[in-house]
């Protein structure tokens, strides 16, 4: 099974490299640019998408640009070590937060990680809560996702290969319990079940939308986890989400003591919990075994035809 999926990935990669070279030729660029910039002798086991505050976790960090057939990722990728493991870190919004959620080049970000040899991705996100019991400062290790975005480039398979990848269980079955234990060991109130609904942004929800999401039993709302998590699956990388709750969404305002959502309030909660999130990620990386026992690495098996 692993051999078949490896062959499928090789075919896709060859197809994309060929497309890149053809575009380079049309632009009168040397065809070696792709190999020099993306197939460098850099390597990482684990990738992290997050905010710029996570740079301090990485030891012996160096930064590299990785060019992809889908354009450039959000920023340079920082390579180094965390807990003795080779790690690649990429700020999904760019260092200066210049890319709002609806324009992030999610495909380039995911592809760059794959080119570096990354097999597992940790995706911390700042999120709003749709339930009073899920409080600001808590963390949710999501187990399901609902996509409410529009127009995002959310697949590597626009043709000619028809591919239908299972996304029934969006997050890695091996990484989720590791993340839950790591966060709880850090003393963080952690919810091990949660559905995250991803909205287009950059605006927050209307009151009607928020109440609708909450009425469906969903716990968390965010703007970036899709298609980031799904693209990792298409590239057969494991993905785990860590949702830091920064505020209650607007639909909960009528409940006692709950204030309206604002960007300033979100950033205040995020800043006050940044060290806890970083410590939790360190523990996750430290406790992640090298061998994968999940199905993420064979996601393409039976998906193409």
Question: Predicted segments — roles?
Answer:
Residues 3, 22, 26-32:
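Short, low-complexity intrinsically disordered segments enriched in A/P/G/S/L with frequent Arg
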Residues 223-263:
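Zn-dependent metallopeptidase/amidohydrolase metal-coordination segment
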Residues 250-303:
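His/Asp/Glu-rich mid-to-C-terminal helical/loop segments that flank catalytic regions of hydrolases
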